[in-house]
C-alpha cells in the first residue's frame, strides 16, 4: 500500500514539477511571483481539449498546438501588461498585482466561453496497467513521468547549453550589466515567458 501511494505521489508530483519550472523561470529573472501562471496552465488544458475533442486535430498535434498557444499567451502577457511597467520603473508590487488581475481575467474568460463544469481530459495512453508486485502502475502515470522528465531535460538544455540560455542566466544575475553587454533583456524576458507558458 505504501509503495503504491509513493508511486501515485511521484506521478502526480511530476506534473506539479513542470508547473513549478514555469514559476521558477520567471522568478529567476524578474524576481516576480507570476500569479497568472496557474491560469495559463488551465487555459492550455482547455485549449488542448478544444483542439483534440472539438476540432479533431488528434492528440499529439492538439497538445503541441496548445503548448504553442500558451507560449504565445505568455509573450502577450509580458508585452502588453508587464513590459510597460518595467519601462516606467514601477515597483515589483505593481507587476505582482498585475499578474493577479491577469489570472482573474483568464479564469473568468474560461468560465464565460467554456464553462465551469468538470470535464475529463481524453485518455491519451489507453487504460493499460503494469504490475510490479503489489504496485499497479497505469500507462498514463508512466507517460506522465516520462514526458515530464523529457520536458525538464529540454528546458535544462536550453538554459545551460544555448546562447539564449546564457543570456537568460546573465539577465538573472545582473540585468543592467547584461544590457551593457548588448543583451536584449526585454527579448530574454519575453522568451522566458514563452518557455514558462510552454512548460
What are these model-predicted stretches?
Residues 103-131:
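Extracellular/periplasmic helix-loop junction at the C-terminal end of a transmembrane helix
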Residues 136-199:
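Helix-loop-helix "hairpin" substructures at the membrane interface of multi-pass membrane proteins
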Residues 23-26, 48, 73-74, 78-79, ...:
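Alpha-helical transmembrane segments of polytopic integral membrane proteins
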Residues 56-102:
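Alpha-helical transmembrane segments within multi-pass membrane transporters and channels
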Residues 2-53, 80-90, 94:
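Single transmembrane alpha-helix segments in multi-pass membrane proteins
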Residues 31, 53-57, 86, 114-118, ...:
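Short helix-capping/hinge motifs at transmembrane helix termini and TM-loop junctions
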Residues 1-8, 55-62, 90, 130-145:
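Interfacial loop-to-helix junctions that mark the boundaries of transmembrane helices
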Residues 16-20, 40, 44, 48, ...:
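Alpha-helical transmembrane segments in multi-pass membrane proteins
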Amino acid at each position: 500500500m505504501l509503495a503504491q501511494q509513493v508511486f501515485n505521489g511521484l506521478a502526480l508530483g511530476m506534473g506539479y514539477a513542470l508547473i513549478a519550472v514555469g514559476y521558477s523561470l520567471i522568478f529567476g529573472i524578474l524576481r516576480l511571483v507570476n500569479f497568472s501562471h496557474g491560469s495559463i496552465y488551465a487555459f492550455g488544458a482547455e485549449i488542448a481539449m478544444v483542439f483534440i475533442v472539438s476540432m479533431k486535430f488528434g492528440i499529439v498535434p492538439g497538445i503541441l498546438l496548445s503548448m504553442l498557444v500558451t507560449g504565445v499567451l505568455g509573450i502577450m502577457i509580458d508585452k502588453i501588461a508587464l513590459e510597460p511597467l518595467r519601462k516606467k520603473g514601477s515597483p515589483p508590487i505593481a507587476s505582482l498585482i498585475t499578474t493577479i488581475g491577469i489570472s482573474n481575467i483568464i479564469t473568468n474568460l474560461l468560465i464565460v466561453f467554456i464553462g465551469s463544469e468538470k470535464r475529463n481530459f481524453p485518455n491519451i495512453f489507453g487504460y493499460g496497467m503494469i504490475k510490479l508486485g503489489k504496485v499497479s502502475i497505469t500507462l498514463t502515470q508512466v507517460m506522465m513521468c516520462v514526458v515530464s522528465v523529457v520536458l525538464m531535460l529540454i528546458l535544462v538544455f536550453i538554459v545551460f547549453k544555448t546562447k539564449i540560455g546564457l543570456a537568460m542566466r546573465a539577465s538573472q544575475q545582473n540585468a543592467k550589466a547584461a544590457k551593457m553587454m548588448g543583451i536584449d533583456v526585454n527579448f530574454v524576458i519575453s522568451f522566458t515567458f514563452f518557455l514558462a507558458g510552454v512548460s
